[in-house]
Amino acid sequence: GENAAIIATGIQAKVFIVDKSSKRLNELKTKFGDQIIPLNSDEINLSDYISECDLLIGGVLVPGANAPKLISKEMITSMKRGSVIVDVAIDQGGCVATSKPTTHANPTYVVDDVVHYCVANMPGSVPMTSTLALNAVTLPFTLKLAQEGYQNALSSDANFLAGLNVCQGNVT
């Protein structure tokens, strides 16, 4: 969501960011200032503002669970004709009631005059770029693990500890 906001504010779009976390909304407001309108994620805010959307990007992530359906069919019908929904959460079931997985070969479909783009594994459309991005993000962790060993890395870095699933034959 934040990366989409960077691009959208860069082209002077009116950007609403919806999140459940007030702390996260404050962080984003500090970063973007008056370029964004932060909103608490609730049905009233979503219903009030969705009719203004030309582009809705659903970037919901609940680690280890399906994405909640935040956008109802009724909300979709209130959107402008030709509006676009990009449901990035489609890999976790999607956050829009009318979303269904599509492919790179057949990426879009229309429901109630609203275009839906719900391609699972969106980074797969740019494999070289996504591989470089993944390597850039994971390399520091790989180097730390190689330099410190897994036990020191786990004890000195909360990110490693949060990512631990199995250790010495035990599910953590």
Residue ranges and their predicted role:
Residues 11-13, 34, 67, 81-84, ...:
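Structural beta-strand/beta-sheet cores of well-ordered domains, especially the beta-sheet scaffolds
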Residues 3, 19-23, 41, 48-55, ...:
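Conserved active-site and cofactor/substrate-binding residues in soluble primary-metabolism enzymes
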Residues 8, 30-33, 53, 70-73, ...:
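Short, glycine/charged-enriched secondary-structure capping and boundary segments
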Residues 90, 95-172:
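Adenosine-phosphate binding glycine-rich loop
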Residues 1-61:
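Glycine-rich phosphate/diphosphate-binding loop of Rossmann-like nucleotide-binding domains
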Residues 58-111, 115:
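ADP-ribose/adenylate-binding Rossmann-like module
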Residues 16, 39, 84-86, 117:
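Hydrophobic/aromatic beta-strand patches that form the interior of the parallel beta-sheet core
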Residues 20-22, 43, 61-62, 89-95, ...:
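Short, ordered loop/turn segments at secondary-structure junctions
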